[in-house]
Design a protein with these regions (language model features):
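Short loop/turn segments that connect beta-strands within beta-propeller blades
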Residues: 70-74, 127-131, 171-175, 214-219, ...
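Short loop/turn segments immediately following the C-termini of beta-strands
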Residues: 61, 107-109, 162-163, 205, ...
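A short beta-strand motif characteristic of beta-propeller blades
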Residues: 32-38, 75-83, 132-139, 176-183, ...
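Structural signal for beta-propeller blades
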Residues: 64-67, 110-112, 123, 165-167, ...
Length: 324
């Protein structure tokens, strides 16, 4: 009899535990993130990236700090300090999960009214899990604007250089960056992505161009072509590849887009078009696109400089890929 009672108690406990687990899971789904807020002030994040487990990582132009929101968290906390790897002003960030590496664009941003600082542009790498500094790769003569990053299937790293319209390359195992492509079509090169065709796609933040660069069998840059977009792009910025021929794109004029490439054409579909504070970056977590608004006018507009820009956030936008 005692054994039967004990078995009954254990069964009831198991059912209760299962109910609690289901309740927790349901609560987690109900509490799905609608925004991720950076826990700081005046940081001016310009780029975001994410990992498959749902962590979201932010850079910081003004403070050089890298912030991280844990999976499911609606708050991004300081994670990597500028003293780690001698970070300066952070632009692009990219999570390379295959290499277990976070790639970071670090530049020195001139401050109006102050002496021109010595250039110190570099692509830096950190351990994606721990945040520990790994290595720094200087841009030629330490000059230029390292803006954003993409990684090819073979592990080659590509980074845009905005000031002179270039794409730099770091081959697997290489110790130095090299200029891979330079052309007037790449003027104001900003966002970058790699699609299944192996080509490199680059936009121009000032030109509105979306350019495809073929990769030759020896790895050198091949034919370069400006794609015909279904509508003009206005201040295109950060891009992320999310399918064989699909890119997510932030437009500084207030939109987050899906771009589907088909031959020489690119179909642009606006996912949301009412952002007020200059979207500069996107990242996909599950079926949600997080769109970062950088509020760069508070850095660049004399009328707004010194005013409080308020908190910086990435906003969730539901995403269903286009049928192709």
């Amino acid at each position: 009899m005692a054994r039967m009672k004990k078995a009954l108690v254990m069964a009831v406990a198991a059912v209760a535990a299962a109910g609690v687990a289901l309740a927790i899971a349901g609560g987690a789904l109900a509490a799905e993130r609608t925004q991720i807020t950076v826990k700081d002030s005046g940081e001016f994040p310009e780029s975001i990236t994410s990992t498959k487990d749902g962590a979201v990582i932010f850079g910081s132009i003004s403070k050089g700090i890298i912030y991280k929101a844990a999976p499911g968290s609606a708050t991004a906390e300081p994670w990597i300090q500028p003293s780690s790897g001698n970070l300066k002003n952070v632009l692009g960030v990219f999570a390379d999960e295959r290499a277990r590496t976070l790639w970071v664009c670090s530049i020195v941003r001139p401050v109006p009214g102050q002496p021109e600082p010595a250039p110190d542009t570099a692509l830096k790498s950190f351990n994606l899990k721990t945040g520990a500094f790994k290595k720094s790769y200087d841009f030629p003569d330490h000059k230029g604007t390292c803006n954003d990053i993409a990684v090819a299937k073979d592990g080659t790293i590509y980074a845009t250089e905005t000031a002179e319209g270039k794409v730099l390359r770091l081959k697997p195992g290489a110790s130095k960056l090299e200029v891979w492509a330079s052309d007037p079509l790449l003027a104001s090169a900003d966002g970058i992505a790699v699609l299944a065709d192996g080509a490199i796609y680059v936009n121009g933040v000032r030109t509105g161009n979306l350019v495809r660069i073929a990769v030759k069998p020896d790895g050198s840059a091949g034919t370069m072509m400006k794609l015909e977009t279904s509508r003009p792009l206005s201040r295109p910025d950060g891009m992320r590849s999310v399918g064989p021929n699909t890119i997510l794109l932030a437009e500084g004029e207030g939109r987050a887009d899906e771009v589907v490439v088909n031959g020489e054409k690119a179909e642009v579909r606006t996912l949301r078009g009412d952002f007020k504070d200059q979207p500069t970056a996107v990242t996909l977590v599950g079926k949600t696109v997080f769109v970062l608004e950088a509020k760069l006018n508070y850095l660049n507009d004399e009328k707004l400089k010194g005013q409080d820009p308020g908190p910086f956030r990435a906003t969730a936008v539901a995403y269903t890929p286009s049928k192709q």
